[in-house]
Amino acid sequence: MTRYDDLPYRTCVGMMLINERGLVFVGRRAGVEQVDDSYVWQMPQGGVDPGEDTWLAAKRELYEETSVRSIEKLAEIPDWLTYDIPRVVAGRAWKGRYRGQRQKWYAVRFIGEDNEINIANPGDGHKPEFTAWRWEPMQNLTGLIIPFKRPVYERVVKEFASLAGAQAGT
């Protein structure tokens, strides 16, 4: 059996979807990563297929989780951000193959209407990742995410903070 510290990171992407008011999409997560029901909200994220471009993966994942296609790319964090999942969860999450995620993050402007968002029947027939969704001020995101992902969200918010004000016209 592979030791936790020797497990690799799963390569993933994350998307900060910002509306015209400068608010950010968050979804109420349904899944095995939940270790505390207090922190069940997150931004869309998901795995990168072997050989897949990260920007294309991010657009695909956003569509598969929200049905959203009406976006404009605003920014990208050049670094890969990582987090470790708790050891108690590691044996169940991703069938015990990974210790956490290595993520490339993008910020995008949502240029569609809210009725484009469909988490109940997401794009390409994928299983729903979220049970509810809402628009949230960017500064609130770190308090909504599960604690082991919080350092990544702190960095994402710091990197993209200027985009919320620009979107809101402030």
UniProtKB/Swiss-Prot annotation:
Give all residue intervals belonging to the Nudix hydrolase domain: 8-158
GO MF assignments: bis(5'-adenosyl)-pentaphosphatase activity; guanosine-3',5'-bis(diphosphate) 3'-diphosphatase activity
Q: Which residue ranges traverse the bilayer?
A: none
Q: Per its Swiss-Prot or TrEMBL entry, what cofactor is needed?
A: a divalent metal cation
Q: Write down the InterPro entries for this protein, in alphabetical order.
A: NUDIX_hydrolase-like_dom_sf, NUDIX_hydrolase_dom, RppH
EC number assigned by the record = 3.6.1.-
Q: Which domain of life is it from?
A: Bacteria
Function summary = Accelerates the degradation of transcripts by removing pyrophosphate from the 5'-end of triphosphorylated RNA, leading to a more labile monophosphorylated state that can stimulate subsequent ribonuclease cleavage.
Q: What is this protein called?
A: RNA pyrophosphohydrolase
